[in-house]
Amino acid sequence: MIVTSKQVAKLGTITSEYEHFNEWKDPYPYGLSDISEDKTITSQDVLVQGTLTKGNLLDILRIFTLFVEDPKGMGVIKIAPRYQQFRTVKKIVKRVKEGKMPDEKGGIVWHTQGSGKSLTMMQTVRAIYRDPELSGFKIVFVTDREQLEKQLKDTSKSVGYTIHDAYSIEKLKDLLKTDTPDLVMAMIHKFQEREVEEEFPLLNKSDKILVMIDEAHRTQYNILGANLRKALPNSIKVAFTGTPIGKTEQTFGDYIDKYTVRQSVEDGVTVEIVYEGRTHSAELSDEEATNAKFEDVFHAVEAEEKQRIMGRFTWRAYLEAKEVIADKAKDMIEHYITHVFPNGFKAQVVAVSRLAAVRYKEKLENALEEKIKELEENNTKNIDLDTLKKLKVAVIISGSPNDDTQVFKNEYVNEHEHDKNIRSFKLPYGKSDEIGIN
């Protein structure tokens, strides 16, 4: 569905909210000169050239249009591609078909966070398997976080493909040894033998394997990345990243496509990050006991190294201190209720550690309770107290076998609780359990 206003045109679907209609800013594989060489080119001109030419329109319908469950619980919604997703998939397929060597067939996709990389990866799967020359490829997804793995699996359902989960090292080896054209999902740490000294084996020499690595900048510069390349030496590797660093290009080659933060903000896909400095006056209690404990643990360490350790761990201890967190939590609640909550928005707090996250929950709840009592006596700004009283604070942290269960309660590390809280957080107020702060 296309909406127009004067010279501006945007693409969406019958289920799209207005904010999800987007301009089509690149007519790829055409250039602007294909539209006109002697007149001003409008937004409408670019969209018509980029989406309504016969080949592009058919591809948008067959490859790029998806049906997914509405995260707001409103049933099934229809999703149209954004121009950078269409362009990237086309470039990946072109490179895979035209490159001479595996390194020439792969490369880096730099798409900023929140721009739909998971959908782009699944649209690539569709495009590969619809191409007669490439339909025999095995496609391997590699990620380094369970959240990303789950996101890719959920996205795969929307395109009608089943992903084989390499839930163990041995299962991974079995799946990669075959030349069957299927989808395999693996966490990067599966590319490591249980015994550190043991080398990871060569598993498949086929050049009909496409490896797509999500958030590649985080994982590919150590032995695990080397093992991946050793296991599949002739595979084509496409690295997706939202925050590229120098080593990404050194490892995976040149860029296939770029979609930067600035472009994303200009397109309204992501919001601009605004930084506001805050100060507080909290002081640590029992400093003498803290220093004594430090000396007890590090008494045998040389003075220079001790200073380095003290600088690193004193700062972390400071950020985890209950007094500091309580002071910050009070300031956060004050700012949130004054500037954010009245606009219907929720809030996220990123902590320095899991311990700090758990402590923030307690202190935010305390600060919220105090603020509500204050507003019950004096509510000159007419804050919605009924909704505010339902507001909940949730903790989302990962578990560890070494956890102190008294500190990290099961509910804090339980994936089912995580999913429930995240779903609630994504819903607007009035349509959820009112998880307002994560």
Regions found by a protein language model. Give the residues of each.
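Interdomain helical connector at the RecA1-RecA2 junction of SF1/SF2 helicase-like NTPases
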Residues: 249-345, 360-377
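Inter-Walker segment of RecA-like/P-loop motor cores
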Residues: 157-196
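Conserved C-terminal RecA-like helicase domain
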Residues: 312-437
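Structural recognition of the conserved hydrophobic beta-strand(s) that form the central parallel beta-sheet
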Residues: 2-4, 184-187, 211, 236-241
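Short basic/glycine-enriched coil/helix segment immediately N-terminal to the Walker B
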Residues: 100-105, 134-135, 177-180, 196-209, ...
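Conserved helicase ATPase motor motifs in RecA-like P-loop NTPase domains
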Residues: 113, 215-219, 231-248
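ATP-dependent helicase/translocase motor core
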Residues: 1-138, 147-162, 179-180, 189, ...
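Conserved RecA-like ASCE ATPase "motif II neighborhood" in helicase/translocase motors
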Residues: 183-213, 218-227, 435-438
